[in-house]
Amino acid sequence: MARTIGSNGEETAARIRACALELIASQGFEAMSMRGLAAAVGVQSAALYHHFATKQALLADLMMSHMRDLLTAWQTTFADHMEGHAAASDRLDAFARFHIRYHISRPQEVFIAYMELRSLSPVHYNAVSELRRDYENLLKAILQDGVDDGSFQIDDIHLTAMAILAMLTGITTWYRPGGRLSASAVEMQYAAMVRRMAVDDIGESLPVQKQAKQRPG
């Protein structure tokens, strides 16, 4: 049976995105050519432009899709945590575990989302950055709730949120399935570290750590 034009177009667009992810992750955005992408997809170069007007538009689509999917996945999977039915500490634990699980399952998307921000045009950069802020604000809201109810000791919500996200996302640079630690073990240990970051008063502990380093060995 012949495929409809619509379904064929959607399948082609999906193949373009999948091949673009592989090529950009392995070669870099600047090095990837639309001709090379067309060859990987198995279409003529002109066919690419029926789906994406420019190479820049394709990159923006990949990064916007990654952030939208991330936001949707959190809202769908952990809607009960978002609605305040759980304590802030439980929501923070759920957020940390979700972030790890989602990101290690999509290493190419994560790599491109962070390493190719510099390749976006100003308009696309601002659009992607707005979605990133939406996600960051989810974590900030959890941290603020914990401060308000007295369960967290945090001097700077923004700084702590950025530190947590950097630590959690950094897992994708070294984690590989089949390694020494399972995904569940990584989730558990990193969630515990995130919890300590929120519960401990990091601001007050820094001078103590500095003094400890100055002691003669």
Where do the PLM segments sit?
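Hydrophobic/aromatic-rich alpha-helical bundle segments in the mid-to-C-terminal region
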Residues: V110-Y114, Y125, S129, V147-M193, ...
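Amphipathic alpha-helical linker/stalk segments
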Residues: A18, M64-D93
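Short amphipathic alpha-helical elements of helix-turn-helix/winged-helix folds
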Residues: C19-L23, F98, Y102, M167
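Amphipathic alpha-helical segments that line or abut small-molecule/effector binding pockets
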Residues: M64, S89-I104, H158, M162, ...
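Helix-turn-helix
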Residues: E11-R15, C19, L23-A57, D61
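Short secondary-structure transition hinges
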Residues: R101-K140
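Amphipathic, non-transmembrane alpha-helical scaffold segments
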Residues: L59, M63, M67, L92, ...
